[in-house]
UniProtKB/Swiss-Prot annotation:
Its cofactor is [4Fe-4S] cluster. It catalyses: adenosine(2503) in 23S rRNA + 2 reduced [2Fe-2S]-[ferredoxin] + 2 S-adenosyl-L-methionine = 2-methyladenosine(2503) in 23S rRNA + 5'-deoxyadenosine + L-methionine + 2 oxidized [2Fe-2S]-[ferredoxin] + S-adenosyl-L-homocysteine; adenosine(37) in tRNA + 2 reduced [2Fe-2S]-[ferredoxin] + 2 S-adenosyl-L-methionine = 2-methyladenosine(37) in tRNA + 5'-deoxyadenosine + L-methionine + 2 oxidized [2Fe-2S]-[ferredoxin] + S-adenosyl-L-homocysteine. InterPro entries: Aldolase_TIM, Methyltransferase_A, RlmN_N, RNA_MTrfase_RlmN, rRNA_lsu_MTrfase_RlmN/Cfr, rSAM. The active site is at E95 (proton acceptor), C345 (s-methylcysteine intermediate). Reaction proceeds by a ping-pong mechanism involving intermediate methylation of a conserved cysteine residue. It comes from Desulfitobacterium hafniense (strain Y51). GO terms for biological process: rRNA base methylation; tRNA methylation. Its EC number is 2.1.1.192. Belongs to the radical SAM superfamily. RlmN family. Binds 1 [4Fe-4S] cluster. The cluster is coordinated with 3 cysteines and an exchangeable S-adenosyl-L-methionine. Keywords: 4Fe-4S, Cytoplasm, Disulfide bond, Iron, Iron-sulfur, Metal-binding, Methyltransferase, rRNA processing, S-adenosyl-L-methionine, Transferase, tRNA processing. [4Fe-4S] cluster binds at C120, C124, C127. S-adenosyl-L-methionine binds at G172, E173, S204, S227, L228, H229, N302. This is Probable dual-specificity RNA methyltransferase RlmN.
Length: 357
């Protein structure tokens, strides 16, 4: 009697798949074949593995899950941004976003913003995800599955479609699901899978200081973005409750350690909120970052029902940016994508939950 635990094949790297295939009584080379079908070609069921016989496919089906995320809803913005609401095997829903950017160096840039948790425990004041609380962590297969299933859907329209960049900026705090996120990155980077370069992937964190240091040691090639939002602990406590555990002094020390170990610049994200995007706030950010290898990305906040926060004026955004530039801080204003479809994380999922109540 076979008592071996049935595993999600999307969770497994080539070595693990090879071992699992051997345990199923299959030739070891099947592991590489299965990995390529699942991770590179983003197949949705075992019948699509055309170079594997029916008998071996049945063994794979008996010993491994191949269960794609199910698309529940899709919204398409006027700028081409697509927002997907997917349902997991246990019925939970998650969001991810596909953003297309201008052609550069003769190649299209297709960026997927992925979620790492169902809900979020951090509870940032301007984020829709945290309004419903934290449910659970996503598995490596569920994290990278967002990329695979978007790839599969888009290849119905363009057979040559390929995701080029990943940002871990969707639902959840990536560094609170650390092991699963790093495993997903490993799988996405594999040249026989999606083959996405480490430097084309960026993790965004609310400021989990110990994990920032650990990331510098475990994977120094992946980009890091820190949700800063304020240079004052009192304000940041209100915007990002994580600050009460890891206040600015501890966070910035971890960031300095990160740049010392990796020699890589950190992107500091600042959500600009009407009434708070002041010159005084900009000057405080400039002073905080003056000795840090940093780039500031300004994000005019998306209005979210239930937060009471409004967007700043274009003049407020411009003055904030100019102030930082005058202090020698590199700064950019995020190119907005999908504003007409509520593309910020958590909004589509929250909309569905409100409809079902």
């Amino acid at each position: 009697m076979n008592t071996m635990k049935r595993m999600d094949c999307r969770d497994l790297n080539q070595s693990e798949l090879t071992q699992h295939c051997a345990e199923l009584g299959l030739p070891k080379f099947r592991g590489r074949q299965v990995f390529q079908w699942v991770q590179q070609k983003a197949v949705q069921n075992w019948e699509e593995l055309k170079n594997i016989g029916a008998g071996d496919r049945q063994k794979l089906q008996d010993g491994l899950f191949l269960q794609p995320l199910r698309k529940v809803r899709e919204q398409i913005s006027q700028d081409g941004t697509r927002k997907f609401l997917f349902r997991c095997a246990d019925g939970e829903t998650l969001e991810c976003v596909l953003m297309d950017y201008d052609r550069r160096k003769n190649r299209d840039r297709h960026t997927v913003c992925v979620s790492t948790q169902i809900g979020c425990a951090v509870g940032c004041a301007f984020c829709a995800t945290g309004l419903g609380g934290w449910r659970r962590n996503l598995s490596p297969g569920e994290i990278l599955g967002q990329v695979l299933d978007i790839t599969y859907l888009m290849r119905q329209e363009d057979p040559d479609f390929q995701v080029t960049n990943i940002v871990f900026m969707g639902m959840g705090e990536p560094l609170l699901n650390y092991e699963a996120v790093l495993k997903a990155i490993e799988l996405l980077n594999d040249p026989e899978g999606q083959g996405i370069g480490m430097r084309r992937m960026t993790i965004s964190t609310s400021g989990v200081a110990p994990k920032i240091r650990q990331l510098a040691k475990d994977n120094p090639q992946v980009g890091l973005a820190v949700s800063l939002h304020s240079a004052h602990n009192t304000t940041r406590d209100q915007l990002i409750p994580m600050n009460r555990k890891y206040p600015l002094e501890e966070l910035m020390e971890a960031c300095r350690d990160y740049t010392t170990l990796t020699n890589r610049r950190i992107t500091f994200e600042i959500a600009l909120i009407s009434g708070q995007a002041t010159l005084e706030a900009a000057q405080a950010v400039g002073h905080l970052l003056k000795r840090q290898l940093a780039h500031v990305n300004l994000i005019p906040v998306n209005p979210v029902a239930g937060t009471g926060m409004a967007r700043p004026t274009a003049k407020e955004v411009q003055q904030f940016a100019q102030c930082l530039e005058s202090m020698g801080i590199p700064v950019s204003v995020r190119e907005e994508k999908g504003t007409d479809i509520d593309a910020a994380c958590g909004q589509l999922r929250r909309q569905l939950e409100c409809e079902q109540k």
